[in-house]
Swiss-Prot record:
Class of the enzyme per the UniProt entry, highest EC level: transferase
Source lineage: Bacteria, Pseudomonadati, Pseudomonadota, Betaproteobacteria, Neisseriales
The encoding gene: rsmJ
Binding residue positions for S-adenosyl-L-methionine: R129, D130, E145, R146, D199
Keywords: Cytoplasm, Methyltransferase, rRNA processing, S-adenosyl-L-methionine, Transferase
Keyword Cell membrane in record: no
Family matches, as HAMAP family: 16SrRNA_methyltr_J
Catalytic activity: guanosine(1516) in 16S rRNA + S-adenosyl-L-methionine = N(2)-methylguanosine(1516) in 16S rRNA + S-adenosyl-L-homocysteine + H(+)
Signal peptide: none
Protein name as catalogued: Ribosomal RNA small subunit methyltransferase J
């Protein structure tokens, strides 16, 4: 096992078989990183090398690629607008300023009370929205993401957040780890983290309202978390206080096991699982 530390707090940790595909497979045609005037050669090379991505000179006619526009990295396609991770403006800013503080459901779910600020591992980081909320409430959050596309978007978003006066202290509490979360958690000592947070993506059943085209594209490229049951088991063996699983309000349980408790909101539900003894050697 080896670990490489990149700028912006990125910790890249992979098994010795670094060239092996990750369990979360990209299910759409993703081409790589597009060189644009908005990115320096050094930054392009760092992202390409850090995430195993090819560099492109021209945009493809079809499929998906990553590109910087006006200093922001986005997932692009001919068929929709860019998908970006952003912790500075837009929805992140609104939620930071008006999201309800410690009274919002995700805060209650992770056990935020009074001065208690649990250490959290967001093991399915995605675009980092919930992780940023937890960090904005004072928690130290490790974002673990195995998709090279999602991890690259997060890396870029964290870099921008660290440069903005309104968010740099929040972003300083966030560390990005590019790894398979189940493998990474299995290497951590039992009880070394207070809370493990899971928000796995699953195939669209057609029963929920249609997501925006951009988010549909993100899920198509990143892929579904079909091994989330294994991740839950490992998470319960590592968490010192609880594991939180975010689900649609009426969604099925992640596994057949009933949670120890639940926090139910208007559209989402947080299933709370107690820690388990670590697996025997």
């Amino acid at each position: 096992m080896h670990e490489m530390i990149f700028p912006c707090g990125l910790s890249h940790q992979r098994s010795s078989a670094d060239n092996a595909p990750l369990p979360r497979l990209m299910v759409a045609m993703f081409h790589g990183l597009l060189a644009t005037p908005d990115v320096s050669p050094a930054t392009l090379e760092r992202f390409a090398a850090g995430y195993g991505l090819s560099c492109l000179a021209t945009p493809p006619d079809e499929g998906y690629w990553l590109a910087w526009r006006a200093g922001v990295l986005g997932l692009e396609s001919p068929h929709h607008g860019a998908v970006t991770a952003d912790f500075v403006g837009g929805a992140a800013r609104h939620r930071r300023e008006f999201g309800g503080g410690a009274g919002q459901p995700v805060a209650r779910a992770i056990g935020l009370k009074g001065s208690q600020r649990p250490q959290v591992v967001d093991a399915t980081a995605g675009l980092g929205r919930d992780a940023f909320v937890m960090a904005s409430l004072g928690c130290r959050v490790t974002l673990v993401e195995r998709s090279p596309v999602a991890a690259a978007l997060l890396d870029d978003a964290l870099a921008r957040a660290r440069l903005d006066p309104a968010t740099h202290e929040i972003a300083a509490r966030m560390q990005l780890v590019f790894a398979d979360a189940a493998d990474w958690l299995a290497q951590q000592p039992a009880g070394s983290v207070d809370v493990v947070y899971l928000d796995p993506m699953f195939p669209d059943t057609g029963k929920s309202a249609a997501a925006k085209k951009e988010m549909q594209a993100f899920q198509v490229v990143v892929g579904d978390d079909l091994d989330a049951g294994r991740l839950l088991l490992v998470a319960r063996q590592v968490a010192g206080k609880r594991v939180v699983v975010k689900r649609p309000r009426l969604g099925a349980l992640l596994t057949g096991e009933k949670p120890a408790g639940q926090q139910v909101g208007k559209s989402t539900r947080f299933d709370l699982y107690a820690p388990l003894p670590p697996a025997s050697a």
